[in-house]
Amino acid sequence: MSTNEEFAGKVALVTGSSSGIGEETARRLSALGATVVVNSAQSVEAGEAVAAALPGTAVYIRADISNQDEAHGLIDATVERFGQLDFLINNAGWTTEVPHDQLDDLTDEIFRKTFDVNVFGTWWLTKRAIPHLRKSDDPNIVNITSIAGVRPVGSSMAYSMTKAALNQMTLLLAKSYGPIRVNAVAPGLVATPWTKDWDALH
C-alpha cells in the first residue's frame, strides 16, 4: 500500500460509503493511509464488506443519519474508537425520482425524508463533529452536493433544493469555522447502483 504523509495517521468518516461515490472515496482515503470509518443506514453486509476489503485500518458503523441520536452516535463512536476525527465526508444522501413537472407525485413524505437525510443529517453530523475537528492539525469537512444544487436538473425538486442548501451550508461553515477547511464537491449524474434504473436522467 502506497501511503501519503498528508493522510497517514488521520481518521476519516465517510457516510453512505457502502457503495457508489462513498465507497470509492473510502477506498481512496484508505489507500492513501487514512484510517476509515465506513457507514450506511442499510446495506449492512455491503458496508462490512467494503470495510473488510480496505487496505488500511477500517471499521463499519451502521447509523441512520436522518435520526439525530444515531447521527450523533456515529460521531461519538468514531472518536471513542480512534481517539480523533480529522476528515468528515458528508456523502450520505437519499432521493427518489419524481419528474419536476409532476408536483402531485412529490408527496410531503418524500419531501421530508429527502431533507431529513440530506440536510438535517449532514447538519447534525457536522455540528457534532466540529469540536473534535478543532483538535485536529488538519481538519476537513467535504460535503458531497450535486450539480442539481445549481442547475434546474436532478431526480426531484426536493433533492435539488437539499443540494442547494448544502452548498450554502458549505460556504457559511467555511467562512465561520476556520481553520477547518470546508469544501463541497458537486458531481453530475454518476453511474452507481443507485442510478442504474434512472433511464430518463441518462
For each predicted feature, which ranges?
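A glycine/serine/threonine-rich, flexible loop-to-helix segment
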Residues: 155-158, 188-202
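Conserved glycine-rich cofactor-binding loop
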Residues: 11, 18-19
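Conserved glycine-rich Rossmann-like NAD(P)H-binding loop of the short-chain dehydrogenase/reductase
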Residues: 32-49
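Residue(s) in the substrate-gating loop at a strand-loop-helix junction
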Residues: 146
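Substrate-binding pocket helix/loop in short-chain dehydrogenase/reductase
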Residues: 99-103, 107-112
